[in-house]
Structures are given as C-alpha cells and as structure tokens.
A protein has these predicted regions:
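Mature N-terminal segment immediately following signal peptide/propeptide cleavage
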Residues: 29-37, 41
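N-terminal, post-signal-peptide region of Sec/Tat-exported proteins
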Residues: 47-89
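Boundary at the C-terminal end of the N-terminal hydrophobic targeting segment
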Residues: 22-27
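N-terminal secretory signal peptides that target proteins for export/translocation
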Residues: 1-5
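Short, solvent-exposed loop/turn segments at the edges of secondary structure
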Residues: 19, 106, 175-177
Length: 192
C-alpha cells in the first residue's frame, strides 16, 4: 500500500476502535463500498485499483462486508451505490472509499467513472457520479458513524475549459451527523 493509503487505514482503524458500536458484536453492521478506477481512456492511473483492493482486504479483516468495484463505468458505480444503500443499517458503520479521477464544478464533487465522455461542462452531471449521492445514502441509513475517503484530487483536466470548474475537490459541508470525510490532499488542492 502507498504511504497515503497506510495513513488512511490507520485513521480508519482508530475510528473503528473508538466507535462504541464497532465492537465484535456489531461486525454484521459494518458495510463498505470501495471503488478504484484506473483504466481511463485519457490515460491509466497507476494506483487506484491496487489501493482499492488493499483497502478492501484490510476492511474485511476488520469485519466489514465489502462491495468492491474495479474500473467501474457509471452504471456499475450507480448500481454499487444502490446496493451499498440497501445494506446500510441504522446504528452501524458505513464506509465509502474512492480512488480515481474526481473533479469539482460549482462547489460540488463528482467522481469520474471509466468511459465517461465529458466534452462540455453540462456533460458532468450525466457522465459522473455526484458525490452528494453517497452522503444521501448514508443520511438515509441514519448510521452512528459514516466514513468517506476520497483519493480523487488529481488534476482536473477540465478546470481551464469549464467556467465553474475548480482545482481539487470541494469541502463537504452537508455530511450527515457522525460523518468523517478524508481527502488525499487539502480541499481545493490537487495531489500528484
């Protein structure tokens, strides 16, 4: 695992240890959706699929039920999110991990699936997964602890051509109570 992934895992491990319902008796209430997208037509990213697989393996050791998607298109990401939402249970722990391309437009974060065709700003809402949908699923479950880890702050290839695009990802301000959001870099910045 990369150094950043190890840091994320350590933070995650500490959160799970200190959260009361994360005891061994509550392991059936831990659900994680892990998505790693590497095989983009604009160029393959080296680490996302490997990081997703490593994170899934570690979470399974911590008693999570894991939904793992590698190189998912939009439909695959949406179906996985629906499955994740259906499995979340009140009082449990929900975790979402994404590694791949992400972008910020108009203050909202979007996760870029494999096969996305984004030629103009208006394509974003039809060709990407709005990160707000993940928070909506978590809010609907009313879990005591939600963890969102976004390793998606790479260069936004559209930031120069789209009026409302910005570098990096936006700060999440509408997360449900009890939600921990972690980025691979500071909001508004990009990672190498």
């Amino acid at each position: 695992m990369q150094a950043m992934s190890i840091r994320i895992f350590l933070i995650l491990f500490i959160l799970i240890l200190i959260y009361p319902s994360a005891s061994p008796a509550a392991t059936e209430r831990r659900i994680a959706l892990i998505i790693g997208n590497s095989a983009y037509s604009s160029g393959t990213l080296k680490n996302p699929v490997n990081d997703a697989a490593a994170m899934a393996s570690q979470l399974q050791k911590l008693g999570f039920t894991v939904i793992l998607k590698k190189n998912a298109n939009l439909r695959g990401m949406e179906d996985a999110l629906t499955d994740f939402g259906d499995r979340l249970k009140r009082g449990g722990v929900g975790l979402f991990f994404y590694a791949g391309h992400g972008l910020q437009v108009g203050g909202a974060n979007y996760l870029v699936p494999i096969g996305a065709r984004i030629n103009r700003e208006s394509d974003i809402r039809y060709e990407t997964l709005d990160a707000g949908k993940i928070l909506d699923e978590m809010a609907n479950a009313n879990n005591g602890l939600n963890i969102v880890i976004l390793d998606a702050c790479r260069d936004n290839p559209y930031s120069r051509s789209f009026r409302n695009a910005a570098r990096g990802l936006a700060i999440v301000s509408n997360a449900p109570v009890g939600t921990f959001v972690s980025y691979s870099t500071s909001p508004g910045k990009r990672s190498p």
